[in-house]
Amino acid sequence: MIGKNHQIALVTLAERKSRYILAAQVPGKHALGVTAAVTRLLRPHKGKCYTMTFDNGKKFAEHETIAVELDADIYFAHPCHSWERGLNENSNGLLRQYFHKEMELIGVTQEQVQWAVDRLNHRPRKVLGFRTPFEVFFGKTVRYTKSPLGVALRN
């Protein structure tokens, strides 16, 4: 996901089964920055990461480094076939609720990105039986109680 003036980008990763999202800021869309961000995001989840599907952009030129670092298989979508990475495209669309296309990402902090990602990872999804991506990915149940204000509060 790229910002308005193409100076800052967000690398987004989506886990297929749980719909769990990870995202990090990178300066531009250069291969070394993207590679560092992907490995930094996935290193804590190395045991759960077996395959990745990337688009054919130059930003993934260092894909072999990612594969070795994370001991994962890398696949590439066909050129101009964004539907082969539908979950990632959908995740980018959900993130656009917080960071719209006309927005300069240069003023956005990593904490703000993480806040938006956390909101999405704790949003119940119909496809997951109204569980959250966080619950499915980590195998934990988060209980929500109804407050007198009519909003759900986390216990």
Feature annotation, model-predicted:
Residues 1-21:
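An active-site-proximal beta-strand-loop segment
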Residues 2-6, 23-46:
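Active-site beta-loop-alpha junctions of metal-dependent nucleic acid enzymes
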Residues 13-16, 39-41, 68-69:
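Short, solvent-exposed amphipathic alpha-helical segments in soluble enzyme
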Residues 19-24, 76, 101:
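Short small-residue beta-strand/loop micro-motif enriched in glycine and branched aliphatics
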Residues 23, 50-54:
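Short catalytic-loop micro-motif centered on adjacent basic/acidic residues
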Residues 47-48, 72:
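Loop/turn elements at helix/coil->beta-strand transitions in domains of secreted/extracellular proteins
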Residues 54-56, 61-64, 69, 76-99, ...:
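RNase H-like two-metal-ion nuclease catalytic core shared by retroviral integrases
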Residues 101-155:
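C-terminal domain-tail junction helix/linker
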